[in-house]
Structure formats: structure tokens, C-alpha cells
């Protein structure tokens, strides 16, 4: 997969993508990440990329032409079609479902805004989709782009050392539940012990415990997800069991 990122700070994206899963994806040739700076396509001695908004008001707006020329260069660099995605708090929320859709693409272009935003005409004519990583405002789209790169990279075949790791993540699977708790060594600690069932070697019992915990954790923390999960009879039974076993004060 190839991801092109248009940003006034492409080195920021490169640094974020140099480590961990995304860095490994690039090393293995499973992800190609390329940064593009619209300032390099701006005209004049100052290579200006922003100006004051028509109608007045605070802040500056990114200009059409540097962005358009930069996008032209991006599209000329690879003949494969690629959706142009603008990172914006007004966009479609980034979910695991959307991440899986994006991960199937051979290529995409991410556009990072700055200042008060981008000239609306560029968004209307050049952008195919706007994506939001949350209901808050950042200084620019770079952090959002880094999130998209990470979530998409880890879904590429061969990136994770254990393919089951992604399949068991929160929001994965057809019902999109939260993940169950995980434990490692030591088995006994001052802060608590590992549940006996996880040390039993009984794979069926372990699978049942994990499913129950996943259902229960979703009910406690994201009950809205259960409304869309369409739980079957056995899952409803496990959730009822979780509720009965819940200690007073654990509803957090």
C-alpha cells in the first residue's frame, strides 16, 4: 500500500512512522509512505501558502494553488487512482470499520490542514472524503494523518507478527466489541493475581472467559456498541453471568 501525505510538516509524519508497526511495515515493503510539502509548489520569494480569509475574521486560510499544484505532483508520481482524504473535525469519524475499508485500497492521499483550515474550493473540487479522529480541534491534520497511517498499516497482511493479534483487537469482528483483559508474568503480584482460568490450560474455558469479559467490558464502557451488536442467546447468557458476578463498585 502507498500513502502520500500532503503537509507543511512532512518530516513530522516521517518521524511518527519510523517506529513500531508502521516502521516495520515500511521495512518489509508492505507500506510506502511519501510526504509532500505544498510550500515547495508555492510561488514568489516567500513561497506563501496562506492568506487572510475573505469576510474578515481571525486566522489564516491555506491557499488553493500550492495545494492544487502539490496534489498534481502527487498524482503524477503514481498512476494508480487514490482517494484524496482531508483530515478534519467535520469529517466522517474514524472507526475500525472505516479503517478496514481504507486498508483494502492500494493507495490513498492524506491532506493535512493548518491555520483556520483550507480554502473550501479545494475541498469541494479535490477532496473525496473528510475523516475525523475525534470531536476536538488540533493545530493541524498531521496527528490525524499519523493515526490513519498507523491504523491502516497494522491491517496490512504480514505487518503484525501474529495475524490473530489484529483479529482480536477492540472493535474487530462482526460485532465490534471491546477486547478482553490481558495478563502476563508474574502470575502473582501485589496488585493482583492472574485469573485461574487463564492458567488452567483449558482452551474452551479460556475462550468462554474471554468472550464473557469482552461482552462485560463493552457493556461497562461502551454500551452503545451492544445496541448494534445483535447478540445471540449464548452471548446474552454470558453477559447476564458477567453482571451477576460483578462486584459492587466495579461498574466503572
From Swiss-Prot:
<dbReference type="InterPro" id="IPR023148">
    <property type="entry name" value="tRNA_m1G_MeTrfase_C_sf"/>
</dbReference>
<dbReference type="GO" id="GO:0005829">
    <property type="term" value="C:cytosol"/>
</dbReference>
<dbReference type="InterPro" id="IPR016009">
    <property type="entry name" value="tRNA_MeTrfase_TRMD/TRM10"/>
</dbReference>
<dbReference type="InterPro" id="IPR002649">
    <property type="entry name" value="tRNA_m1G_MeTrfase_TrmD"/>
</dbReference>
<comment type="function">
    <text>Specifically methylates guanosine-37 in various tRNAs.</text>
</comment>
<feature type="binding site">
    <location>
        <begin position="133"/>
        <end position="138"/>
    </location>
    <ligand>
        <name>S-adenosyl-L-methionine</name>
    </ligand>
</feature>
<feature type="binding site">
    <location>
        <position position="113"/>
    </location>
    <ligand>
        <name>S-adenosyl-L-methionine</name>
    </ligand>
</feature>
<keyword id="KW-0949">S-adenosyl-L-methionine</keyword>
<keyword id="KW-0489">Methyltransferase</keyword>
<keyword id="KW-0808">Transferase</keyword>
<dbReference type="InterPro" id="IPR029028">
    <property type="entry name" value="Alpha/beta_knot_MTases"/>
</dbReference>
<dbReference type="InterPro" id="IPR029026">
    <property type="entry name" value="tRNA_m1G_MTases_N"/>
</dbReference>
<dbReference type="Pfam" id="PF01746">
    <property type="entry name" value="tRNA_m1G_MT"/>
</dbReference>
<comment type="subunit">
    <text>Homodimer.</text>
</comment>
<keyword id="KW-0963">Cytoplasm</keyword>
<dbReference type="GO" id="GO:0002939">
    <property type="term" value="P:tRNA N1-guanine methylation"/>
</dbReference>
<comment type="similarity">
    <text>Belongs to the RNA methyltransferase TrmD family.</text>
</comment>
<protein>
    <recommendedName>
        <fullName>tRNA (guanine-N(1)-)-methyltransferase</fullName>
        <ecNumber>2.1.1.228</ecNumber>
    </recommendedName>
</protein>
<keyword id="KW-0819">tRNA processing</keyword>
<dbReference type="GO" id="GO:0052906">
    <property type="term" value="F:tRNA (guanine(37)-N1)-methyltransferase activity"/>
</dbReference>
Amino acid at each position: 500500500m502507498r500513502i502520500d501525505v500532503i503537509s507543511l510538516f512532512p518530516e513530522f509524519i516521517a518521524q511518527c512512522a519510523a517506529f513500531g508497526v508502521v516502521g516495520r511495515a515500511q521495512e518489509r515493503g508492505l507500506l510506502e509512505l511519501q510526504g509532500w510539502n505544498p510550500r515547495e509548489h508555492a510561488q514568489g520569494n516567500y513561497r506563501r501558502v496562506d492568506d487572510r480569509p475573505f469576510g474578515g475574521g481571525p486566522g489564516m486560510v491555506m491557499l488553493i494553488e500550492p495545494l492544487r499544484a502539490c496534489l498534481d505532483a502527487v498524482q503524477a508520481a503514481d498512476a494508480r487512482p487514490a482517494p484524496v482524504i482531508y483530515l478534519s473535525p467535520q469529517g466522517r469519524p474514524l472507526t475500525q470499520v472505516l479503517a478496514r475499508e481504507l486498508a483494502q485500497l492500494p493507495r490513498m492521499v492524506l491532506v493535512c490542514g493548518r491555520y483556520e483550515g483550507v480554502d473550501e474550493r479545494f475541498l469541494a473540487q479535490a477532496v473525496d472524503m473528510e475523516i475525523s479522529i475525534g470531536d476536538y480541534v488540533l493545530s493541524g491534520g498531521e496527528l490525524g494523518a499519523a493515526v490513519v497511517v498507523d491504523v491502516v498499516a497494522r491491517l496490512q497482511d504480514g505487518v503484525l507478527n501474529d495475524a490473530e493479534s489484529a483479529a482480536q483487537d477492540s472493535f474487530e469482528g462482526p460485532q465490534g466489541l471491546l477486547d478482553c483483559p490481558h495478563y502476563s508474568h508474574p502470575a502473582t503480584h501485589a496488585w493482583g493475581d492472574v485469573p485461574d482460568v487463564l492458567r488452567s490450560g483449558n482452551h474452551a474455558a479460556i475462550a468462554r472467559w474471554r468472550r464473557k469479559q469482552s461482552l462485560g467490558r463493552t457493556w461497562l464502557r461502551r454500551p452503545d456498541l451492544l445496541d448494534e451488536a445483535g447478540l445471540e442467546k449464548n452471548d446474552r447468557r454470558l453477559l447476564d453471568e458477567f453482571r451477576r458476578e460483578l462486584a459492587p463498585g466495579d461498574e466503572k
